[in-house]
Amino acid sequence: MRQFQSAARLEQTLGSVHDTNNDFSWSAAIERDEKEQYPQRAVDFLNAVGMNRFYVPSELGGRMEIGEELLYLHRVLARRDLTINSTYSTNAWSVIVWIGGNANQCQNIASRILSGAAPALAYSEKAHGADLLSSEVTAQATESKYVLNGEKWSINRATLGDSLSLIAKTSNDRGPRSLSAFWLDKRHMASKGTYSLNRLPTVGMRGLDISGIGFNNAEIHKDALIGEEGQGLELGLKTLQVTRAYCSSFSLGAGDTMLRIATEFAIERELYNKKVISIPLVREQLATAYAYLLAAEVLSLVGARGLHVCINQFSTWSPIVKVLVPEYVESLAKITSSVLGSRFFLRNAYADGMYQKAFRDHLIVSVFDGSSTVCLDSLSFQLKSANKGRSKKADHLNQAEAKARYRQLYDLQVETDAIDFRELEIFNRDGDLVMESLGTIIEMLNDSDATVGLSAETLSTLRERADQLLVEQRTLDQKIQDYFSNSEQSKEFETLRFSLARGYAELFARIAVLGFWVFNRHGLRPALQDGSWLIIFLNTAEGQTFPPITSLRENTLVDLLDRISTNHMLSVIDFALAPRDAKPVKKEITP
């Protein structure tokens, strides 16, 4: 499929993860991590093969066209080294310009990104973290300039980057219009009122340039302002909608590496006169971990396609993806670490310690670009309006048109229109296409053409799960209505608001994964068509703790073992990895 071809080329271009002389190998990643070394050579290589083009819209000379494309490019990097992935991902902060910049700014920033610029995001401050409205960095307007004062702290690429996406106060009040957004070219500010803050040592991704920048009467031109004065919070939050969705690439890459290493260990390790992989409990654990990874991938794919199909709903979709995808991979990590046993605690006793690096690195994914608490808080305040928008649509729903739109969202074979970032909204009043799709999903599960080849037992289980999702949806809708209709309760029971957001997110995810499978089933490889992995995921996500049926476990595990033995990504996509003896080749990844 076209949306995965660039990532497939990148994977082959980067060479084998087992080549010790390769900057993109696991051994190189571990060596840099031990030295806390910034991956500059890897960054230069990625620029040379044209990956930077995928952050710039096509009308500005780039290749930023397909949501899934950038997701999988970063997944390819993340399975090798989350430090490289995190460093290079700061290019995505240019989205703030595509959202709010004027024509000249868009062209100028596009040229900078295409020439290899290294941007950073300067939102957070040491005293305030994610509380942007409490920001203390100020931008005082003069006739032709802004004068900056204050410090931005804990910023990726703050020192080594050459550009900054900055949020600063342009008003003394604390309201939402007190902040403005700027794009700074640090090359024009050298020694002119700016200074670097010390690099911060980190638990994982130790080679990152996590530092800060300070301003002391630093002057910038008025044309550094993105959008209008007072639009900073709006533009910043819209940009975060996009970057939060792409954070899932970190989880997918780390999850692939951890599950691959743990499975290979189980295949090789012998205990009690038999291979560990032959132990039923271990087989169950690995099958469950694989189901989590596939579900995380599917939720990420649906999110990426949502940027095309219903971008005005993305203010609720993005926090769901950002919360749950890392959580699914954290569950995978908990499972696979138990498979490794004592080897998990030893830093380099197996696979040179790459599992431990991926485990450490992934710990921060649920925090950056908005923690789970921040994301659920954002989601919770939109539950009423999203449900209201969905209810309005239900009254005027054309079933044929609705199904075509659901297919556009879920079906990977259906090409989507280009993303228009200017259509992003701060608040979702349009409804929820995933939640709306459940009725059609249930209809398709009762359609003999859609379910041909499924066993009676599997079909019965999936129909039962889908019906249960509908019951849960109606119950949750009522709870949301009751909560927001009682203003006193809304003020008093804040924890209930978070609980409703959590319930909404988890329901959304299960519907999305089921919907993806229903609409793509006949295009998936046979091992995934039978729904075994899906049932394991749905059962686990619903809190069922009893072991999966043996046939479900074995069907899922067989596919996992096949992906590893044939050197494929652990994915719903048939994605071949670079051969074990492949060398990196500095070749353009664009056709």
List each model region and its residues.
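Amphipathic, small/basic residue-rich leader segments at the start of a protein or domain
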Residues: 1-88, 108, 424-492, 501-504, ...
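A short, Trp-centered hydrophobic/proline-enriched beta-strand micro-motif
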Residues: 54, 115-124
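N-terminal glycine-rich flavin-associated loop
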Residues: 82-104, 129-132, 142-145, 267
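A structural signal for short hydrophobic beta-strand segments in well-ordered beta-sheet cores
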Residues: 137-140
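A short core secondary-structure module
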Residues: 149-195
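Glycine-rich beta->alpha junctions and the first turn(s) of the following alpha-helix
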Residues: 202-293, 404-508, 512
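Loop-to-helix element that buttresses phosphate recognition and phosphoryl-transfer chemistry
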Residues: 263-264, 281-311, 326, 519
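Extended amphipathic alpha-helical segments with heptad-repeat/coiled-coil character used for oligomerization
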Residues: 303-402
